[in-house]
Regions:
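Structural beta-strand/beta-sheet cores of well-ordered domains, especially the beta-sheet scaffolds
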Residues: 3-5, 28, 78, 157-159
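Feature captures the catalytic cores and cofactor-binding loops of soluble hydro-lyases/lyases
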Residues: 13-141
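Secondary-structure junction/capping motif
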Residues: 93-97, 175, 189
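Flexible inter-domain linker/hinge segments
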Residues: 122, 136-181
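Acidic-leg catalytic submotif of subtilisin-like serine proteases
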Residues: 192
Length: 192
């Protein structure tokens, strides 16, 4: 982990940073998300299938990952980018770090690039094909792979993310969730 990693866009724009996920090569449509929190939900949101998601908030990973906050059974995005991955996870519900989660789920991820510059480029040009790599660091090879990667336009991604069978949601609220809202009523006043 923390080996060199590279993002190259189909137009040849290059960003070099550090790996915070699995080793390998991943292609996808590079997009951004402006949420300050919820990175775990973004990782497991099926609507990000085939996309490399860039987080605009500067530090990601500070509350770790837990099995209660997933949107689906596994991550669906192609890759993940952030400015800085927090080395400290501070949440009593956390079961693993963001880096551990990305690695164990085979997600190629990158930190340490100028995400503001990348987001500005995407905002002006629109989403574009890109490639994340920790193994092939040859610019020419990566640009060609990004340009020749399959487009998401017209692709039936629903079939790729749909579970094979329906699941029943019958869990109760976690023990830390307040069961009674009577304490809120004490602050209510009668205005009539």
């Amino acid at each position: 982990m923390n080996s060199p990693a590279i993002l190259i866009l189909a137009d040849g724009t290059r960003f070099v940073g550090r790996s915070i996920g699995a080793d390998g090569v991943s292609v996808g449509e590079v997009v951004f998300n402006t949420a300050m929190t919820g990175y775990q939900e973004i990782l497991t949101d099926p609507s990000y299938r085939g996309q490399i998601v860039t987080m605009t908030y500067p530090e990601i990973g500070n509350y770790g990952v837990n099995p209660e906050d997933v949107e689906s059974g596994r991550p669906h995005l192609s890759g993940f980018i952030c400015k800085e991955n927090s080395r400290v996870r501070s949440n009593f519900r956390s079961t693993e770090s963001l880096e551990e989660y990305l690695t164990s789920n085979g997600i190629v991820a990158l930190e340490g690039i100028d995400t503001r510059m990348l987001v500005r480029k995407l905002r002006i040009s629109g989403a574009m094909k890109g490639i994340l790599s920790t193994t092939d660091l040859d610019d020419t090879s990566l640009v060609n792979k990004a340009k020749n990667s399959e487009s998401l336009v017209g692709k039936d991604l629903v079939q790729e993310v749909m579970p094979s069978e329906a699941s029943l949601w019958n869990e109760e609220l976690s023990e830390w969730w307040p069961v009674s809202y009577t304490h809120l009523r004490a602050h209510e006043t009668d205005t009539d």
